[in-house]
Amino acid sequence: MMDSPFLELWQSKAVSIREQLGLGDRPNDSYCYNSAKNSTVLQGVTFGGIPTVLLIDVSCFLFLILVFSIIRRRFWDYGRIALVSEADSESRFQRLSSTSSSGQQDFENELGCCPWLTAIFRLHDDQILEWCGEDAIHYLSFQRHIIFLLVVVSFLSLCVILPVNLSGDLLDKDPYSFGRTTIANLQTDNDLLWLHTIFAVIYLFLTVGFMRHHTQSIKYKEENLVRRTLFITGLPRDARKETVESHFRDAYPTCEVVDVQLCYNVAKLIYLCKEKKKTEKSLTYYTNLQVKTGQRTLINPKPCGQFCCCEVLGCEWEDAISYYTRMKDRLLERITEEERHVQDQPLGMAFVTFQEKSMATYILKDFNACKCQSLQCKGEPQPSSHSRELYTSKWTVTFAADPEDICWKNLSIQGLRWWLQWLGINFTLFLGLFFLTTPSIILSTMDKFNVTKPIHALNNPIISQFFPTLLLWSFSALLPSIVYYSTLLESHWTKSGENQIMMTKVYIFLIFMVLILPSLGLTSLDFFFRWLFDKTSSEASIRLECVFLPDQGAFFVNYVIASAFIGNGMELLRLPGLILYTFRMIMAKTAADRRNVKQNQAFQYEFGAMYAWMLCVFTVIVAYSITCPIIAPFGLIYILLKHMVDRHNLYFVYLPAKLEKGIHFAAVNQALAAPILCLFWLYFFSFLRLGMKAPATLFTFLVLLLTILVCLAHTCFGCFKHLSPLNYKTEEPASDKGSEAEAHMPPPFTPYVPRILNGLASERTALSPQQQQQQTYGAIHNISGTIPGQCLAQSATGSVAAAPQEA
């Protein structure tokens, strides 16, 4: 049968492309990571250096475990800082309550020597749920699904793919040759190459199946208050609470408004309240010390004043109680003054709480869903006599986030200022990572200065494999910290949005740093763009076949080994946090300040960064599980150790976080990128080794294209589903559900304050105990008591949704 003209043209173009890339029948293995001649770094060694790297990494892991055990037992309760943190920081899930606190202490004492090690295996999900919240349970459930997936992948890769690769005879017969275990060992005319593509498709379906099972297990207990509260942006800054309430009453007469809260800028007030709280704790500390010892303590409150050995001008000592009393009075004056100016700083935001969830859903649908009439689609909400005054057509309406998810101090940063700040931070971040994205640039620089020439004859695997993979892990560990702090500077309105953006950015940068650029043999994004766009560059024809060099897979196997042992060991030790902790303890001016540092050292678990880092390694494992099946069991070891370390850290180290479920679904979507990249790798192999017209290449291309189209369709429908009214399920009001529903009426609405301000509110207002226990959005209830009869409930940092900021 004659070939079609389309395939003839396709084949000619493919041959032309392969000729431009300088590809022959076999890959050119004279270069991979460095194009410099006679490079002494990253050259092939016995079995890719894997045995040596494994031995060194396991030894380092045991050493890190020993160091952590000593530090945890001897210094500052460092290994369980979440348990010694102040109770106010943990009130979100009633941590350190009378029951759970005593239970925790019994648990610690019961385990005896090295309790943290056995606690990893003895902890139950119920304990983690009570102590750490729902998000920790979903995160650990995600890891367990990844573990089961990698068990299946490891079994198939070792029992099917590895024997197939070993059956080839293209490379040396040396049993110590790592290349014999890779797909590069098979001849191009070997029909067994079809098996690799079929198993890549199987891995894709397995990943989809396991991830779907995980998403079905994600069950969030929606807060009644959250689901019946709407967050509104785009309000005129001079809008009044009564006007907004009248608008909803007139436009939606069937929807009963419980409360309307306007949002004001309280960022400075929150900061002052935090400082006042620290000062009060220090004052209490020295007051109790005086009662106990009968003597007043002298301190030197100047920076590094504790290191002054004598009293000189500018370094005088003073009474601790007098100093902190004076600081407290000064802060109270500033808080009182700031409260008086709060209402002069409106944010143009509000949140409205309704009697029923169905009412909030109905209004959200009216504002967001496109309603088509004839040939026109419009989204104008129902009008009222106040619509023009309130500019309702410019409103952005979303469901409100949980109050614990709000970054209260960031609400004042919005509109053009927010976008300019975001662009500036990310442009600077991109420039910084543009020229330094993989440690290969350091290795090539070492070659230029002949640093490694003396060991050229040794061909030592410690130099050629251990240090490069250690450098790669070090850079991949540093990058999340850089992206983390840059994301904090972006001033997101919710912690969920902050974590989701962080996860996306870290994952993309890590995939480029760890997988794509090293696979292509590129040293940085600078070279990547030059290779991509500069057709006259000498590097433009020498990169793609680097993906399938025999020793290429060994580099990634060693990286996964380093991540499994050194990475998880360092994550348990948390060396950057330990250094910061030590620095803060040294710089604390007084013993009371050091006590405050110790109690405020615990932070919330950054699910976004941790998801991204774990998914990066998972993507490397799956992407090379076909071309280099040896990587799969080491990947399983990595995720098992990661799971145990995270169980320990979530329970003993980090404070619980209250996030939206969107971040867990985003992690599932990113996990699906792993088998897609595996298909990409097989397609590149088929294209470079077999040609475009080969049946295996065409089949892989069609599967890959279909997968990408399905993912794009899913993403697009997910992005635009709010335009369809069918996606807003309206529940029946309680009055239509009978007496059974009436028994579950929502509790009465009572204003609520941000956590840091709640203590002041309870101290200075006459709120009843029942009122203090109920949660709502945004209010500051006459904290200072300086404005008699006036409630500053409107001067609130309102609840926000995890939506992008509007100008």
Swiss-Prot record:
Cell location: Lysosome membrane; Early endosome membrane; Cell membrane
Modified residues (Phosphoserine): S739
Topology class, membrane: Multi-pass membrane protein
Molecular functions (GO terms): calcium-activated cation channel activity; mechanosensitive monoatomic ion channel activity; nucleic acid binding; osmolarity-sensing monoatomic cation channel activity
Residue segments, region Intracellular linker IL2: 219-414
Assembly with partners or alone: Monomer.
Catalytic activity: Ca(2+)(in) = Ca(2+)(out)
Pfam families: PHM7_cyt, RSN1_7TM, RSN1_TM
Residue ranges, Cytoplasmic side: 75-134, 218-416, 491-495, 587-606, 652-661, 710-807
Gene3D superfamilies: 3.30.70.330
Family to which the UniProt record says this protein belongs: Belongs to the CSC1 (TC 1.A.17) family.
Disease: Leukodystrophy, hypomyelinating, 19, transient infantile: An autosomal dominant disorder characterized by marked hypomyelination on brain imaging, congenital nystagmus, and motor delay manifesting in early infancy. Both neurologic impairment and abnormal brain imaging spontaneously resolve during childhood.
Protein name, entry field: Mechanosensitive cation channel TMEM63A
Outcome of mutating G168E: In HLD19; loss of mechanosensitive ion channel activity
